[in-house]
Amino acid sequence: MLQKPRGTQDFFLDETKLWIKVETKLREILNKFNYSEIRTPMFESKELFIRSIGSTSDIVSKEMYEFVDKKNRSLVLKPEGTASVVRAVVENKLYAEDYLPFKTYYISPMFRYERPQNGRYRQFHQLGIEVYGSDSIQQDYEVLNIANNIINDFKLNKNIKIYTNYLITGKNREQYILELKKYLTDFKLCNDCNIRIEKNPLRVLDCKIDDKQFNNVPSMKDFLTDEEQKRYQQTLDLFKEMNISTIHDDKLVRGLDYYTGFIFEIKYEAKNIEQTIIAGGRYNNLVYEIGNINLPACGFGMGLERFINIIKEQNNKLNKNDQSIDLYTICLDQSAIKLNQQILELSRSIGLISDSNYYNMSLKSALKKSDKLNPKYLIILGEKEATSNQFIIKNKINKTEIKTTLTNFVNDLK
């Protein structure tokens, strides 16, 4: 029997309803901050991700789904969303003054060839928000505040921590990297990190195998320029003034090479589980790397699979099955088909979710199906109802019944 590819999922029934509720609520939150949705292609040029993510990253070196098209062009299923948005900004000239700051978001599937595990899939879904054209610390605050609003609005505050750091971009970067390499020589590193330490030592701190042993890593804060120190402190002060609690983490570097300056991760830490659910920061050089245009940018990404798993774990009310149908009709005779369809059309015209027993079944089976759907109203139609054009509406909530006709049907439902 054919099965779905490893690391992918099928969504249906209650699971799909939960996803739609989550996505709808996320869009409502982002609309309040005046962010508009962007949709980019599912596949892009391979070169786009080499330029943006970095050739030494795990994503580019190991995890991309690559293919060559009929004209011998190297393409990949997009492994992350930011590079695609930057490409769209440059290609469509969204850096023009009239558009700035360009505030946008996406909800999209991504693809990475990695080992499937709890909360990690080869096809996964990501919410991303992006802001282009603003280098203000207020913009950094807004980005983290949106993430914080998402956590609060979904009532997931329990076991949540926000970690921050500031990646060196100034003249002291090379000095810090030398100090870091010196520190790392005392450790036995995994094969990947032995390569990273030569190409990009900062990436060693993001290693999921070795990171637990780096307890006294040199602090980036000690190497920041006066200007960087001032900006980072002003950003942290603003968070504190606005009652957003953060924790500085010297080892926080992010898994993508394009980040510069302020970065953050929001983690869910419970029992023996530690998962990053939202992560982002500044990437002021990325638009230049891709499109040769100086344009500051910041944003974050959120894995929806992990986020929805936490909703389920915390027994969030969004995960509760609410009444999913307003009206169910049971049609027991061929002569009642027209009346049945007329009732359904009328009920849907006033916004009721309505269904019927289209599958040929007995009254007993149809009533069992009705009990499963738990409708507010139930109507049973047979030859008698078709002949008289009268039928009974059963209110399953308050256990009342009313006899009506098509003419009075809508009024009698109110």
Curated annotation (Swiss-Prot):
EC category name: ligase
Matches recorded under CDD domains: HisRS-like_core (cd00773)
Pfam families xrefs: tRNA-synt_His (PF13393)
PROSITE patterns, A to Z: AA_TRNA_LIGASE_II
Coiled coil feature spans: none
Keywords: Aminoacyl-tRNA synthetase, ATP-binding, Cytoplasm, Ligase, Nucleotide-binding, Protein biosynthesis
Classification via PANTHER family: HISTIDINE--TRNA LIGASE, MITOCHONDRIAL-RELATED, HISTIDYL-TRNA SYNTHETASE
Family: Belongs to the class-II aminoacyl-tRNA synthetase family.
Protein's name according to its UniProt entry: Histidine--tRNA ligase
Organism, scientific name: Mycoplasma capricolum subsp. capricolum (strain California kid / ATCC 27343 / NCTC 10154)
